[in-house]
Amino acid sequence: MSSLYYANALFSKYPTATSVFSSGVFPEQTSCAFASNPQRSGYGSSPGGTFPAGSAAHGLYSNGSSLHPQSPAMYPSSYGLDAASFNMHCSPFEQNLSSLMCAGDPTKQNSAKAEQRESELHNEANLRIYPWMRSAGADRKRGRQTYTRYQTLELEKEFHFNRYLTRRRRIEIAHVLCLTERQIKIWFQNRRMKWKKENKASSPSSNSQEKQETEEEEEE
């Protein structure tokens, strides 16, 4: 009994659903209210609330070419487009084409090449060439080849064991000592001549040995 009393006291504070709807808090609206509203923002409808279906159909189907209009009048004036705006990208293309045509002029190309040559010659004249930068060409004056102490020591060791070198051994020594094959060959020839002068004798055996050595040098 007490629980029912408290429940009635609680629900009596709030109005019923019928009283709420009858007072107009939630006005009844049907689906026809959306169609009857003349001002629907976002769809751009006419004040009458309906679209001119007849005029639209006539504009679409009256002419077959209307589906692909060629005139820029199809764009509204609100976009700020006119007939000249569609040709805005033509001018850069024409400028590039004209520049390419001008680049093919032989007189201008020759003048540009001449200016480039003059600038290169001017830059070369300002460069300072050191002796170690010069190439060893045919026009260079041939001088005496100097060998370092290490190179001379290694060549003397090799000459002590072999007075004549094979081509393979000559290439190996040239690679180790950072010399050319021709330099190794010339050094051994000069060293053999020096050795012959030091050990020169009048014995026939020595003369025959010298002849044999000269023949071997000619074969090389």
From Swiss-Prot:
Q: Which GO CC annotations does the UniProt entry carry?
A: nucleus
DNA-binding region(s) from the entry: 140-199
The cellular location(s) given in this protein's UniProt record come to:
Nucleus
Q: Name one GO biological process term.
A: anterior/posterior pattern specification
- Keyword terms of this UniProt record: Developmental protein, DNA-binding, Homeobox, Nucleus, Transcription, Transcription regulation
| SUPFAM superfamilies named among the record's database cross-references | Homeodomain-like
InterPro entries named among the record's database cross-references: Antp_homeobox, HD, HD_metazoa, Homeobox_antennapedia, Homeobox_Antennapedia_CS, Homeobox_CS, Homeodomain-like_sf
Any one Pfam family here would be: Homeodomain
- Region named Disordered: 197-220
Record's keyword annotation contains Nucleotide-binding: no
This entry's Gene Ontology molecular function terms read: DNA-binding transcription factor activity, RNA polymerase II-specific; RNA polymerase II cis-regulatory region sequence-specific DNA binding; RNA polymerase II transcription regulatory region sequence-specific DNA binding
Q: Which Gene3D superfamilies match?
A: Homeodomain-like
Residues of the signal peptide: none
For the motif Antp-type hexapeptide, give the residue ranges: 129-134
**Regions that span the bilayer:** none
Q: Which CDD domains match?
A: homeodomain
Q: What does this protein do?
A: Sequence-specific transcription factor which is part of a developmental regulatory system that provides cells with specific positional identities on the anterior-posterior axis.
The UniProt family comment states: Belongs to the Antp homeobox family.
This one is known as: Homeobox protein Hox-B7-A
